[in-house]
Amino acid sequence: MKLNVNPTRMELTKLKKRLTTATRGHKLLKDKQDELMRRFIGMIKKNNELRKDVEKELEGSFKDFLMASAVMSPEFLEEAVAYPKESISVDVKKQNIMSVNVPVFDFKRKLEGDKGSIFPYGFANTSAELDGAIEKLYGILPKLLELAKVEKACQLMADEIEKTRRRVNALEYMTIPQLEETIRFIQMKLDENERSTVTRLMKIKSMMEEKQSNMV
């Protein structure tokens, strides 16, 4: 559907400039979309690999925890893990990836007391299985934190890809076709007006020549 504009040469010039800008913008956005997709696929691959590793390691920790719960009373087990020995602080920064502000988490881990022991309990009334579960969870934590960062980055990039896709489609299927159709319409009207003007001038010339001939 063409735009509702006056078919003048000035309007034609404006529309041609708009078409050039829209075409250039479409190419830039399409390039951005392609690069975002390339990076997104890489992030998804990394996310899947991390999640697979984390789930596998968590499974081992949960098995140890279940074995510990079989030989320890629920009350004492809950008390043993109620007060974690490690504190974690997060410093959040941002990294710009193709106009996407991806969070970069800097985690600081600190063990409290007991010369850095990771166990929040004494060993007298606990089982080796509980020790194993705590050790595994402690070792998994860096991957869990990295997984959180990667998953958030994937989510933000997916949102940006969708926004870019909508803008590309709007230019490709609406704005550019409308401009092209309107330009063709104005050009056609200008050509018609020019032919009409030429025909009218030729008639006037013919009438003047005929008049001069009759006067002689």
Swiss-Prot record:
Pfam families: ATP-synt_D. GO terms for molecular function: ATP binding; proton-transporting ATP synthase activity, rotational mechanism; proton-transporting ATPase activity, rotational mechanism. The keyword Ion transport applies. Keywords: ATP synthesis, Hydrogen ion transport, Ion transport, Transport. The keyword Magnesium does not apply. One of its GO terms (biological process) is proton motive force-driven plasma membrane ATP synthesis. Transmembrane segments: none annotated. InterPro entries: V_ATPase_D. Belongs to the V-ATPase D subunit family. Produces ATP from ADP in the presence of a proton gradient across the membrane. This is V-type ATP synthase subunit D.
